Amino acid sequence: MKLLFELSKDGNISVPALSKKLGISASVLYSRIKRLVKKKLIKKFTMEIDDSLLGIGVKASLGINRDPKFKIQIHKALLEITEVVSIVEVTGRFDTMIRVYAKDLEDLHSVVIEKIGKIECIQNTETFVELQKTDKELTYLNKNT
């Protein structure tokens, strides 16, 4: 678990640096990482992007109610919208939640009204604009410390 915790904090850390941090040999560590990848416990090594440098100034979640018979068609239509970055089926007052990244509030408004709002069989939406975000480390991976 310590290995996964450290990799979740920095997937780009070198094997020698990580082996020193964890107190195990680099060859053993390399074998463990390969095994975790093979078992698909580690799906991918990724990076964190500063979205603001790409012109993304507004992030929002949208709750969507839709006709259940048209779930697949609605998902396909949503995936064609560049600003939609994820789609999640949920329980509760919405059927679906999506994440939208936009340049600014005007752009977000345009995406919600002109693109998402025009998809057939979407009954209604509610937009939640992200004001501040704080990510927590994956502490469940760090139980042994």
Go through the PLM ranges and name each one.
Residues 1-145:
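A compositional/biophysical signature of low hydrophobicity enriched in polar/charged and small residues
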